[in-house]
Amino acid sequence: MKFAVIQFPGSNCDFDLLWAIRDVMGAEAEFVWHDEKSLAGFDGVLIPGGFSYGDYLRCGAIASFANIMPEIKRLAKEGKPVFGTCNGFQILVESGLLPGVLIRNEGLKFVSKWQVLKVENNQSNFTTEYAKDALINLPIAHGEGQYVADEATLAELKENGQIVFTYADENPNGSVENIAGIINKEGNVLGMMPHPERAMEELLGGADGRKMFASLLKNFLVTVKN
């Protein structure tokens, strides 16, 4: 199974993401520049955090029109895994691959710290290695992470079990329903503001991110082989 780690101008978590999936988890992965027009040969996509295009206009807005995006949408439509963290999550909502929008933090300040999350749905392809209602600790680092959506969208997210992670001990950005991460209806696209790729080794502060990548590899490897 081979992953494309997409690089945009301003990405700064790309090496973390590559290290997590390749060096720690043992999967095949390589960088793909945003201006490429093909993802032939790849079985999944990882979109890193950072400040794509300097966060001009809106976070993720310009990146959503990058040349590589039609290919990312193609893989998503084919049921291949697509994961976006932080700015990657912003790109996924701006491109329409996930519902809702991410706006400026409620406190109007950049927040950088370790954050306790609750695993709301451990039956998704990205969370099966976690226990239901497990509390995990992952880093966050963002200024525009407040997730908002209309009532109809929120009702649909709840009904379909698309709310995968919520903020547990406190809400750091004002996200509605404490939402920290969601999946699409089909279950193959996950976006989240926290950074699991930064929680892969106890030596570095914690390893709660490992199970997210382990779930991804376990569940999608079967799909790719079939």
From Swiss-Prot:
Q: What is its EC number?
A: 6.3.5.3, 3.5.1.2
Q: Among its keywords, does the record have DNA-binding?
A: no
Q: Which residues form a coiled coil?
A: none
Its localization reads:
Cytoplasm
Q: In which pathway does it act?
A: Purine metabolism; IMP biosynthesis via de novo pathway; 5-amino-1-(5-phospho-D-ribosyl)imidazole from N(2)-formyl-N(1)-(5-phospho-D-ribosyl)glycinamide: step 1/2
* Catalytic machinery residues: C86 (nucleophile), H195, E197
CDD domains tied to this protein: GATase1_FGAR_AT
- In terms of superkingdom, the source organism counts as Bacteria
Entry keywords, A to Z: ATP-binding, Cytoplasm, Glutamine amidotransferase, Hydrolase, Ligase, Nucleotide-binding, Purine biosynthesis
Primary location: cytoplasm
Q: Which reaction does it catalyse?
A: N(2)-formyl-N(1)-(5-phospho-beta-D-ribosyl)glycinamide + L-glutamine + ATP + H2O = 2-formamido-N(1)-(5-O-phospho-beta-D-ribosyl)acetamidine + L-glutamate + ADP + phosphate + H(+); L-glutamine + H2O = L-glutamate + NH4(+)
Report a single Gene Ontology molecular function: phosphoribosylformylglycinamidine synthase activity
GO CC, one annotated term: cytoplasm
The record's PROSITE patterns line, in alphabetical order, gives: GATASE_TYPE_1
Instruction: Tell me a GO biological process for this protein.
Output: 'de novo' IMP biosynthetic process
- SUPFAM superfamilies according to UniProt: Class I glutamine amidotransferase-like
Q: Outline the extent of the Glutamine amidotransferase type-1 domain.
A: 2-226
What this chain does, per the entry, is described as:
Part of the phosphoribosylformylglycinamidine synthase complex involved in the purines biosynthetic pathway. Catalyzes the ATP-dependent conversion of formylglycinamide ribonucleotide (FGAR) and glutamine to yield formylglycinamidine ribonucleotide (FGAM) and glutamate. The FGAM synthase complex is composed of three subunits. PurQ produces an ammonia molecule by converting glutamine to glutamate. PurL transfers the ammonia molecule to FGAR to form FGAM in an ATP-dependent manner.
User: Which proteins does it associate with, and in what oligomeric form?
Assistant: Part of the FGAM synthase complex composed of 1 PurL, 1 PurQ and 2 PurS subunits.
Q: Which PANTHER family match?
A: PHOSPHORIBOSYLFORMYLGLYCINAMIDINE SYNTHASE SUBUNIT PURQ
Q: What is this protein called?
A: Phosphoribosylformylglycinamidine synthase subunit PurQ
Species of origin reads Lactococcus lactis subsp. cremoris
